[in-house]
Amino acid sequence: MAVNLYDYANQLEQALRDSDEYKAIKDAFAKVKENEESKKLFDEFRETQMSFQQKQMQGEEIPEEDLQKAQEQAQAIEKDENISELMNAEQKMSQVFQEINQIIVKPLDEIYAD
């Protein structure tokens, strides 16, 4: 019987949805959305990040004034408890993803280790 990796991937997706880390992100994001100021700061910061990524992908330089604006936004975000909670939750989930990725690529690592 052949192993269907996609079935395992779907099980992993469900396990991630059931995890405490996922629930923490979901709860923290709900708090951000409920608070008008937090939501505005969060949306502006994400918009700035996407703009930077787009410019970098196109090989454009990011103007100094845009960098300054992003730094000011980052400082405001650090002071916002709701967004800080969300960022901490995202960081924990990112750690989980890194650990899962190490497990997933382990068979390939073993092949190339010799």
UniProtKB/Swiss-Prot annotation:
UniProt-recorded name of the protein: UPF0342 protein SERP1381
Source species, domain of life: Bacteria
Alphabetical list of Gene3D superfamilies matching this protein: YheA/YmcA-like (1.20.1500.10)
InterPro entries per UniProt: Com_YlbF, YheA/YmcA-like_dom_sf
Family named by the database record: Belongs to the UPF0342 family.
